[in-house]
Amino acid sequence: MHHQTKLDVFIIRAYNLLSNESVISGASLQSVTNSPQTTTNTPSGMVNGAVGTGIANPTGLMGSDSTPNIDEIITSTGSNALTKTNSDSANGTPNGNSSSTSAISNASNPATTGNNASSSATSNGIYTQAQYSQLFAKISKLYNATLSSGSIDDRSTSPKSAIELYQRFQQMIKELELSFDASPYAKYFRRLDGRLWQIKTDSELENDELWRLVSMSIFTVFDPQTGQILTQGRRKGNSLNTSTKGSPSDLQGINNGNNNGNNGNIGNGSNIKNYGNKNMPNNRTKKRGTRVAKNAKNGKNNKNSNKERNGITDTSAFSNTTISNPGTNMLFDPSLSQQLQKRLQTLSQDVNSRSLTGYYTQPTSPGSGGFEFGLSHADLNPNASSNTMGYNTMSNNGSHSWKRRSLGSLDVNTLDDEAVEELLQLTNTSKRQRPMTTAAEGALINDGPDTNLNANNTQMKVDLNPSNSMGPIDTEAVIRPLKEAYDAIISEKGQRIVQLERELELQRQETQWLRKMLIEDMGCVRSMLRDLQR
């Protein structure tokens, strides 16, 4: 059986259940042109040309063609009166919607909370626009819950919003008004008047197999006594996340005027809103930072700091000189010498290698400007005074801490080409670049027991340890949610396109059906005219 037929019967059955077998007015139903919540307030109490007065007495609702009033019509067919009792008002009137009360309902005692989903704002009355909005929001929740629980064994369906269900129900009523006998849903309705309809009871439709199947699927997830959805199945729960029509944002917009006590689970989008666990990258970052800090405390990751401490014997003089003499800091940055010392320790090349011959003797090499390659008798700052000449280079006994390195002791097999490349690109660290070290990174590196380093050395250590950089992890944390969001949007758009294609096909079939009926009616009119002429 086609899923559209099941959906139509489901809408009829759910409407009959949740509206408490109320009367359906084609005039009030068609007055809502677009959707239950986006239209302007039109006279919803208009039935056959009569505008409702908003009072409890329905006897004044007479049609322009002098048809009987609605109360007499329903009473004659064995239904209850259209007057609204106080108990119904206490169960179902939504808060803030007293202005949109039905023209044939009792306006007294409007309660503010309603927990019973099966109770309606009117008892066997005609629904208004605001009430249609609430009713079809409940039908949408019930359908999506039934679909996700697997009660309807049809995998070709998708979650439906209240707007879709309302428009489909509106279309079925229009078909009944155009041709009641030709409509496949005529067996589920009873005509009360020209534009008044009522759905048949369960006892009248107990022999209909599809009606019984839909009723069983509804009662598996819905309790008519309490008016609450019993359970939310998990078999198709994931489809609610990727569908635009069943998304929580749509349902939230539909339920703007709903009552406070509505217990549907789909109206709350907090449990469906997340596309995966987006906190995973942050947790990984925190965990990795904790592990690095722990290793720094235990001395397991102090290789670079030990090498740097060999060339830093007087950190207090280094810090004072850096602050008191900004000119010296501009001429010769201590981070430059530390980076050079670090790279020279890792650089391996034979003494006779031509790759080093000429490089350290050219005017553009680091040996120029009074900075000798041997570093033993180097005048680190010839322009500075004698009290600042030996900062960060003199040990406690007055000798230089740097020693002349023999290039013959370097291993040619462990040559680091990347180190040579970085040596060629060494530049002076400007003051604008130094504050880039964040407080978190400084606290992470300075957490060791023996890290008596200043801010400049902290910046140097961050530069010399690219393995501890959090850049790749931060990039991954930024890219992953974006990718998930784009995938979800693409999936939603794809399903929306498929749904629009289905609706277009249904409208095309309906157009062909109406065209066929029009041709038949024209043929009938022609034959009647011919008979009259004869």
From Swiss-Prot:
Recorded GO CC terms: nuclear envelope; nucleus; transcription regulator complex
Region (Leucine-zipper): 497-534
The name this protein goes by in its record: Glycolytic genes transcriptional activator GCR2
Record-level Gene Ontology MF annotations: RNA polymerase II-specific DNA-binding transcription factor binding; transcription coregulator activity
Oligomer status and interactors: Homodimer via the leucine-zipper domain. Forms a complex with a GCR1 homodimer.
Locus of motif Nuclear localization signal: 281-288
Region of interest (Disordered), residue spans: 29-122, 230-333
Organism: Saccharomyces cerevisiae (strain ATCC 204508 / S288c) (Baker's yeast)
Primary location: nucleus
Residues annotated with Phosphoserine modification: 151, 406, 409
Biased segments, Polar residues type: 64-88, 238-252, 312-328
Function: Transcriptional activator required for the expression of glycolytic genes. Enhances the CT box-dependent transcriptional activation of a RAP1-GCR1 complex. Required for GCR1 phosphorylation.
Subcellular location field: Nucleus
Gene Ontology annotations of biological process type: negative regulation of transcription by RNA polymerase II; positive regulation of antisense RNA transcription; positive regulation of ribosomal protein gene transcription by RNA polymerase II; positive regulation of transcription by RNA polymerase II; regulation of glycolytic process
Biased composition annotated in UniProt, kind: Low complexity: 30-43, 89-122, 253-279, 295-304
Keywords recorded for this protein, A-Z: Activator, Nucleus, Phosphoprotein, Transcription, Transcription regulation
Source superkingdom: Eukaryota
